[in-house]
Structure formats: structure tokens, C-alpha cells
Amino acid sequence: MDNLGESPTDKGGEPGESEETRATPGALVAADTEGIPEETDRDGDADLKEAAAEESELKSQDVSDVTAAERENSSLLTPAAKKLKLDIKDKKEKKQKVDEDEIQKMQILVSSFSEEQLNRYEMYRRSAFPKAAIKRLIQSITGTSVSQNVVIAMSGISKVFVGEVVEEALDVCEKWGETPPLQPKHMREAVRRLKSKGQIPNSKHKKITFF
């Protein structure tokens, strides 16, 4: 009887315990499975943050290394670079100063011109030899084709040469007590004087004999 009385309670207790014991592993597994993703997410975020921090540190270190290398290179090249910059600056300043002086001198000279001299200057400044004629002349003498730069240079030299001959011819005309316009005799005398001064090369071929 005692055994029969105890058995229901024992049997009742055993099923309760078995249900609890059966339920608790599932609950534990569920709790574990629910907790694992949160921990992995947190760990992943921490890893990403650490990786980003390390990458930023590496970048900052690389930048500092590059800037240090640039500073070292600049310190090594500083004297030569400074000298080159100073030379270029001095040349620019000198050229600018020379240009300003030339402009000022030209302005003073032009302001002192008479009306006739001013007209002559304007005509000379605007005058130019036709480049096609200069090119044909050069090609007929040399027998070869020339570039446009050579034609421009020869045109400018020819203009300067003719200007010098005309100026010398005007001096001859004045010394002879004559008035312009210039005549062929004035031009011939001007060429003769320029040749005697060595300003015009002698076009006649002279045979040099050796003893």
C-alpha cells in the first residue's frame, strides 16, 4: 500500500522532472543559438574597427614617410634649386629692365624727331621686303630650297642693310651740300664708304697667292 501510494507521486514527479529536463536542453540550445549571432556581430564590428584603425595608422605612417622623403630630397636639392630660381629671376628682371630702358630711349628719340625724320622712321618701320622675292633670290644663289625661318631672317637682315646704306647716303648728300631726294651717286658713295669701313663684305673674289 505504501508503495502504491508513493508510486503516483513518484510517477507524477518523474514525468515533471523529465519534462523539465527535456525542455531545458532545448531552451539552453535556443538561448545559445540566439546569443551566438550577437556575439559574432559584435566581434565582427570590433574586427572591422580594428582593421580600419590599423589601415589609417599605416596610411598616416606612409604619408609621414613620403613627406619626410620629400623634405630630405628638397633639402638636398635646395641650393641648386634656389640658385636656378635666383638666376632665372635675375635674368627676367634684367631683361625687363633692358626692355624698359630701350622703350624709354626710343620714346625720347622719337619725341626729338623732326616731322621729316618721323615720317622716314614710320616708313622704315612699316616697310618690309616681300618674302617670296627673298626666297627666290636665296634659292637662285644656293640652288636649294630654304625654310621659312631662313627667309624671315634674310628679309630682316636685308632691311637693316638697306637702312644703313640709305642713312650713309643721306650723310653723303648732306656733306656734299645737296638736298634730297637721294641720287644714284649718293648711294654709290655710301656703299663705297661702308666697304672702306668694313661694314659691307667685298663681293669680288680675290685670288690669294702663296709665296
From Swiss-Prot:
Any single biological process term in GO: mRNA transcription by RNA polymerase II
Assembly and interaction partners: Component of the TFIID basal transcription factor complex, composed of TATA-box-binding protein TBP, and a number of TBP-associated factors (TAFs), including TAF1, TAF2, TAF3, TAF4, TAF5, TAF6, TAF7, TAF8, TAF9, TAF10, TAF11, TAF12 and TAF13. Interacts with TAF13 both in vitro and intracellularly; also interacts directly with TBP.
Q: Which residues carry this modification: N-acetylmethionine?
A: M1
Please give the Pfam families that the UniProt record associates with this protein: TAFII28
One GO CC term on file: transcription factor TFIID complex
- Please indicate which superkingdom the organism of origin belongs to: Eukaryota
Protein name, per record:
Transcription initiation factor TFIID subunit 11
Compartments where located: Nucleus
Q: Where is the composition biased (Basic and acidic residues)?
A: 8-22, 43-73
Q: Which family does it belong to?
A: Belongs to the TAF11 family.
Q: Does the keyword Protein biosynthesis apply?
A: no
